[in-house]
Amino acid sequence: MTQAEIKLCSLLLQEHFGEIVEKIGVHLIRTGSQPLRVIAHDTKASLDQVKKALCVLIHHNLVIYHVHKRGVVEYEAQCSRVLRMLRYPRYIYTTKTLYGDTGELIVEELLLNGKMTMSAVVKKVADRLTETMEDGKTMDYAEVSNAFVRLADTHFVQRCPLVPDTDSSDPGPPPPAPNLVINEKDMYLVPKLSLIGKGKRRRSSDEDAAGEPKAKKPRCTDNEEPTPDDGIYWQVNLDRFHQHFRDQAIVSAVANRMDQTSSEIVRTMLRMSEITTPSGAPFTQPLSSNEIFRSLPVGYNISKQVLDQYLTLLADDPLEFIGKAGDSGGGMYVINLHKALASLSTATLESVIQERFGSRCARIFRLVLQKKHLEQKQVEDFAMIPAKEAKDMLYKMLSENFISLQEIPKTPDHAPSRTFYLYTVNVLSAARMLLHRCYKSIANLIERRQFETKENKRLLEKSQRVEAIMASMQATGAEEVQLQEIEEMITAPERQQLETLKRNVNKLDASEIQVDETIFLLESYIESTMKRQ
């Protein structure tokens, strides 16, 4: 766990949950697993605060617990899961593009609340969608339920592990913490709910003022019927989203390298194997040419012969994204996911080198990568770059850890005159170094955004107050002159300052998302490589 990762986790926890949760979370990230009382002692927080903070972190899957043989419960932070909070906007946007506004709000609610029952999600989303609709229109619960079922069928949401049913006749004491389990076949099983109803609008403030005083909310009594899915909680399946992001990156890479038809064939193959292939598998399941032809999108008019030519072309490509696994069924083909991730990571490294050091350094990097091991003289000759410039460029990349130097001595004394000095590229090491820098970059972006917001806090508060007054006056049917007077409460220089702030914050937000795309590619490649070793 690097300092850059810990700092980024700290910023994310503080932004999402506040100071107390951040304090407990970062303490667990630094120290590893600890029991409750040790956490309270080390952080100087009250036992009640620690319990509440752990409850929040466990509910959002950011902390897990283990029960030891002696019955001691220890809590452990999931740093990698904390870092996934960076990707929340991307998860939500992806769901919007695939399943529309309803799917977007379902995933948003699950991410914001950690875990929820299906009935609670459906009601909340229906209410939110009804709020945005025109007067007189409402969102039906059944429509939201159908969107939820589609998300579960494609594994974007999954059930949370449950407390197993205990035998009431068992005389032994209950365990200090429940051991949650779930059967794999039940993970995407949607409970049969007959949710009948429509979304409700919140009463506006003027209605409350004109009408009767608000009735007190009735307390839940024991006689109140529980919902049919009571105790069945759902969460977002982040691995499935990562699988989708990886597939999109591969399709985009094939489109850039070859053409749109090739990318559509690869997209079809990935879509056919997305449920059957585990998220960390190095290859997809073998697919026959006939199966691929039958599964091509409707209206995509290419003949079987043309498809076979494309598949042969893809299989013969030096990048080896597609491999041939047999000749049955017109030819069996697989997508080499590990090779694809390695190529995407290498392309990312090349792009970074070109941006930082120029095209000549990128040429040397590609050359060393292709030839595996090269002496300085060979680099000069192959790259056709003068000796002095080549030496400077190699040193720059060596000092930044993009390339490494390997010594091969001719004699045991390692004398420089009798030693070969070979330049080589360790892609895994370079990817780790770049990933570390990406974490630093995102932490800097978050800090900058927080600074910009803090500097203009008073102006933002004033703007929000003016907007609230405008909204309430428009609702009561105020005249145009009155509205204009309220608008003029914010002066022209203040309005310009607000525009600049908005533009800067939008740039910083966009930069965060773009850096996270690089983080995703590098993390996927490192994870895939570690599984193969």
From Swiss-Prot:
Residues with PTM Phosphoserine: 194
Keyword presence, Nucleus: yes
A Gene Ontology cellular-component term: nucleoplasm
Pfam families: HTH_9, POLR3C_WHD, RNA_pol_Rpc82, RPC3_helical
An individual GO BP term: DNA-templated transcription
Gene3D superfamilies for the chain: 6.10.140.1450, Winged helix-like DNA-binding domain superfamily/Winged helix DNA-binding domain (1.10.10.10)
Stretches the record annotates as Disordered: 161-183, 197-228
Compositional bias annotation for Basic and acidic residues: 211-222
Subcellular localization, as worded in the UniProt entry: Nucleus
Keywords (A to Z) from UniProt: Antiviral defense, DNA-binding, DNA-directed RNA polymerase, Immunity, Innate immunity, Nucleus, Phosphoprotein, Transcription
InterPro entries with a match to the protein in the record: POLR3C_WHD, RNA_pol_III_RPC82-rel_HTH, RNA_pol_III_Rpc82_C, RPC3, WH-like_DNA-bd_sf
GO molecular function: single-stranded DNA binding
Predominant cellular place of this UniProt entry's protein: nucleus
Family designation: Belongs to the eukaryotic RPC3/POLR3C RNA polymerase subunit family.
Function: DNA-dependent RNA polymerase catalyzes the transcription of DNA into RNA using the four ribonucleoside triphosphates as substrates. Specific peripheric component of RNA polymerase III (Pol III) which synthesizes small non-coding RNAs including 5S rRNA, snRNAs, tRNAs and miRNAs from at least 500 distinct genomic loci. Part of POLR3C/RPC3-POLR3F/RPC6-POLR3G/RPC7 heterotrimer, coordinates the dynamics of Pol III stalk and clamp modules during the transition from apo to elongation state. Pol III plays a key role in sensing and limiting infection by intracellular bacteria and DNA viruses.
UniProt subunit comment: Component of the RNA polymerase III complex consisting of 17 subunits: a ten-subunit horseshoe-shaped catalytic core composed of POLR3A/RPC1, POLR3B/RPC2, POLR1C/RPAC1, POLR1D/RPAC2, POLR3K/RPC10, POLR2E/RPABC1, POLR2F/RPABC2, POLR2H/RPABC3, POLR2K/RPABC4 and POLR2L/RPABC5; a mobile stalk composed of two subunits POLR3H/RPC8 and CRCP/RPC9, protruding from the core and functioning primarily in transcription initiation; and additional subunits homologous to general transcription factors of the RNA polymerase II machinery, POLR3C/RPC3-POLR3F/RPC6-POLR3G/RPC7 heterotrimer required for transcription initiation and POLR3D/RPC4-POLR3E/RPC5 heterodimer involved in both transcription initiation and termination.
UniProt name for this protein: DNA-directed RNA polymerase III subunit RPC3
Organism expressing this protein natively: Rattus norvegicus
Lineage of source species: Eukaryota, Metazoa, Chordata, Craniata, Vertebrata
